[in-house]
A protein has these predicted regions:
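Blade-level signature of beta-propeller repeat domains, shared across WD40, Kelch, NHL, RCC1
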Residues: 260-312
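Conserved beta-strand positions in repeat-built beta-propeller and related beta-rich domains
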Residues: 14, 25, 30-36, 73-79, ...
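A short beta-strand motif characteristic of beta-propeller blades
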Residues: 6-12, 48-54, 98-105, 150-157, ...
């Protein structure tokens, strides 16, 4: 398929560190987080309206829907996994939350970053060191798996900036990004046990001319990955079986943070970007950094996002 048929449209205002898009097929709405501004935001693509819930608890790294519950979300805020009571229909300044469990309990300088729910309703989320003067201490993070017992289990440690994750539709492969490595790795996946094994590098940016580091990612029904490049101005499309770069799509922001498919047929790729800590020059050249963009005409379809299964 040729590049020129792809349209890239801005669908929200520019926010701060927009990240972690999660498509809710039930409501046809897109949730995402604005990490440092401490908001969960919800876009209604039909109207363009964005509603926001302020999370006083701390920076919000990730948000997912909860199974069979229209007005509850689960998010990672600071080092806590929290239950958020919000139906998304209006702005909320005093959002009600409940702490479900905590991770990195032996550390105090880390926070939850990206995460996703697997086919059995378990929440996988990872941590990273807090940014200090633009720097993140290496090897302070961990990737965890949390089921309905709310007891975090360690899957990968140490990592530096735990980021994108995806499972293939056959549910026997798990893909993962620790951003500073500039690699996407694949594992064999056991969906019953929720365990991973046999790590293998499936794409290495260090062996390409691509700029930036891999950040968030998603997978399509063909089993190919879509990866956001933070500092790289692009979303890349990668075949994890061959390690081949299939194509790249330029985004009007340098720091592209994450991607997910949405829309009734899961054919629109929603792309989050960051407007956080930009120089005056960057703001001038990319005034819409921090916005969400919608890519259409890619000729690919996504896989439904899972919701967290809780004992309620």
């Amino acid at each position: 398929m040729t590049e020129h048929r792809v349209s890239v449209n801005r669908v929200t205002d520019a926010f701060g560190l927009s990240e972690g898009p999660h498509w809710d097929q039930r409501t046809q709405k897109l949730y995402f987080v604005d990490i440092t501004n401490q908001y969960i935001r919800r876009l209604d693509p039909a109207t363009g309206e964005v509603n926001s819930a302020y999370i006083k608890h701390g920076p919000v790294g990730v948000v997912v829907t909860v199974d069979d519950t229209p007005d509850k979300l689960v998010a990672g805020s600071g080092r806590d996994v929290i239950l958020v009571s919000w139906d998304g229909d209006e702005n909320e300044a005093n959002t009600t939350i409940e702490v479900l469990c905590s991770v990195d309990t032996d550390r105090n300088q880390t926070r939850i970053n990206d995460g996703k729910v697997d086919s059995h309703g378990r929440f996988w989320l990872g941590t990273m060191a807090n940014e200090v003067n633009g720097q993140v201490s290496p090897n302070e993070g961990t990737l965890y798996r949390i089921d309905d017992k709310l007891e975090p289990k360690t899957e990968v440690t140490p990592v530096s900036i735990s980021n994108g994750l995806a499972w293939d539709k056959e549910d026997n492969k798990f893909y993962y990004i620790d951003s500073p490595t500039r690699q996407v790795v694949g594992y064999d996946y056991d969906p019953q046990a929720g365990t991973i094994s046999n790590k293998k590098v499936i794409f290495d940016l260090n062996k390409t001319e691509l700029q930036g580091v891999p950040d968030g990612m998603t997978i399509d029904t063909d089993g190919n990955l879509w990866v956001a490049l933070f500092g790289g101005h692009h979303v890349i499309h990668v075949n994890p079986k061959t390690g081949k770069l299939l194509r790249k799509v330029k985004i009007p922001a340098e720091n592209v943070t994450s991607v997910t498919f949405g829309g009734p047929l899961l054919e629109t790729l929603y792309v989050t970007t960051s407007g956080y800590n930009l120089t005056a020059q960057q703001r001038k050249t990319t005034p819409y950094a921090g916005a969400v963009f919608a890519l259409k005409g890619l000729g690919a379809r996504g896989i439904l996002a899972n919701s967290f299964k809780m004992n309620q």
